[in-house]
Amino acid sequence: MNLMKSSGMFTLTAIGSCRIVSPVKRAQPYFNFQANFKRIYGFTHTSSEALQQIRFILGLIDIPEKVRPFIFRPNVNYSNTDVHSRSDFYIIEISSQKKIMAYGFCLQINYLTRHFYEFFSQTERACMYWSLATQGNRHKLLAYLKDDPCFAGMSEDDRALLSNINVEQMDEHAIEQDMMEIVQLLGRDRVMFMTHVDAVTRAGTVILSRSRLIKNVDTIAARMDIPCVNPTNLMEKWGQKRALEKNGDDLTHYTDMFGDAIVAAIFKGVINNTNHHLDEGRQEKQDQIREITLSITKQLADGDIIAASQQLFAALRNQQQDPVLIQLRSVIFSHLGYYEQAYQDISDVEKIIGTTDSTLRCRLRSLHGLARWREALSTAEMMLSNEIEDEEVLTVAAGSADALQLFDKSYHYWKRVLLLNPETQSGWVNFLSSTQYFNDGNAFSEAFHAGIQSQRLNDTFMETALSLAIKFSDELIFMHALEQLLRHESEFALTVLSTIHDTGLVIRTAFCIKNMSYHQALRTSYKDKIHDVFEAWNNTALSLHSVDDFVSLSTSLAYSYSAFMVYPHSRISRFNNEVKMAWRDKLREMYEREDYENILAGAKIVWPLLKFDPVGTVYCARTLVNLGAWKDACTLAHMTLIRNSNITSLQSIMLRSIRHINNIPFLIDLIANVMSITLSFQNASMNKLFEKECRNVATRALKYVRQKKTEGRLDEALSVLISLKRIEPDVSRLMREYKQIIRLFNESRKDGGSTITSYEHLDYAKKLLVFDSENAYALKYAALNAMHLRDYTQALQYWQRLEKVNGPTEPVTRQISTCITALQKNTSGKS
């Protein structure tokens, strides 16, 4: 089959986003032209990006390697021998006024935020970064980045780039200068401009910055007497729901058919009048193909693949080389599992019209079906850089990264899959599993707790969690996963318990099983298997019992006490007491000769048991004080005082350690927890000292909050403020700080642009409501973002709470009505 283009045609180049580039490619067979994308390196949004692209294709500038990943499409390389022959006509789309510069070059925001996904995925950090990356704020930006752990973990080149970015909101004059130079470079009779659409949000309002830009581009083009197409009128004729993706809610992407209609309007209204005669027969053919496509697409959506196939193959008998029909055949082949044929078809289509968003999706499905993981990942990443971010694309990206053992990518992609659809159980398992390749357990802990919050887990998730908790020595997650698996009488859990050597986890296992025995009925056969595990641990304790080696003695105590906790038989009890007395004697002897390092080594082994032994705790806590380990000394004293609150020596160690600790969140939690046991402090001087330390910690915490505000770390400031409510009686002082945090966040988020998702905005709003559940700003903010996520149930609750706080108002009443209507439609749709 010969599907290659013929030469000598009218040539057309589109410079802009996928909104114009993809439909121009699709239109080639129907408007008798050839799309010329030689040396076009990627999508553009601002007038300055378009001008930079034009200078590059004309050979006036080169793009340095260090900025190419943030300007060029992924996996695209150009040689210096590539030549862009001037096209007969150029369409220049200008859809943004947010100009991002580094090293004198315009960067593409989607490529930038994809490369630095982890950095920009945190709402507060993204907001603060964009607000500081403006002219005159460089010293503040560098100070902010210097203390950011995510930034610190980047490569030297990445840190340098983020440090050198400058953001500018272009005004009308700057845009006009770019447009004038574009016309000068391309020629007045060869160029036209195009704007974005002035679409409305779910709240029924336009995006003001977009409206201003559309008006500016229209006005400038009119002054220059250059054609300009504003698709807004066409969108209004079509209806926003038909014109824009996601039933009109995606304000960024056009449906294929609306994009095709825009190009048709450009040819009929602009190009046909100046440069190129249209073939009416070809346009009629396009209309026929559109009707066939609509019918087949509906049949596929209804699951009637037989009818869709019959109609398609009937159409192909008359239109064997039509790229739209061949692409539909690729879709059907993928549905049927004929991935080789699907891939061949879509490859043929791309030879005719080039790569578009929809051909990329066909290619993605066929490559995934063929298990060609590297190509599938490359295709998925190209789609993501084109802002095509849905569950299918991210799942293929994550699964391909898994297969290629690129686990850092796998982690980030599974995380994004679960943001879109938290109900996929296999996604949670894969997400958790991908964290095993990180050096620390932070990613593992984050993934586990996110999974727990989703409440959509299974035993496979818990088995993965148990294994990784051992790897990262995370005792709390270990206990959580173990308890769940033991309830289900998991054989996997027993296998794991028989092989662990971490004494902390051995002790945690004993606590877990002892607590379960009061609430959970297990079968006798399973209990016998658990008993065998503890017998083995008791035998380990016997083998390690040595009064000459404190570390071995501590290990023996951990195993013997664990066995005793669950099975307090006389034999096990006697042996445990023997080990405990020998351990305590050895501890006293070592303390007297100031052998602090060995005491510390043994104390770490039996740490969870020390709270049951106040005598041993006093020696260990004093050892920690002598070593300057104030936080550990304080923690040990506190956990023992919870069980034995009247030990004055431990009270003194705990309270006098506080002044040496600089971890403010730790101190707030400590003070709040100690408040519950101070009634047992029988020493007046200890009570007086505690009151003094309470005031001191509260004052230090407020200073910490203000410092974090100054640094722009509003999330940290808010977290501390929420905790501080537990110990600070003067709430008015805290409320002042809270209102300032809201003001600063509101200012910074305006510069966050499209880098921040509604999920993250909603999470932040919920956090604001933790501090003040009746704050009007936070309620409105949460409601709007819940609506953007189509969570109308949650949005309705926020609007109703806002109405209760502020009283009925017309805008809130209208939003409540919108939510109720949406919920009724959802209910009727399901029935």
Swiss-Prot record:
Gene source species: Salmonella typhi
Pathway in which this enzyme or protein is active: Glycan metabolism; Vi-antigen biosynthesis; Capsule biogenesis; capsule polysaccharide biosynthesis
Domain of life: Bacteria
An annotated GO BP: capsule polysaccharide biosynthetic process
Protein task: May be required for maturation of the Vi polysaccharide.
Gene3D superfamilies in UniProt: Tetratricopeptide repeat domain
Protein name: Vi polysaccharide biosynthesis protein TviD
Gene that this polypeptide is encoded by: tviD
SUPFAM superfamilies membership: TPR-like
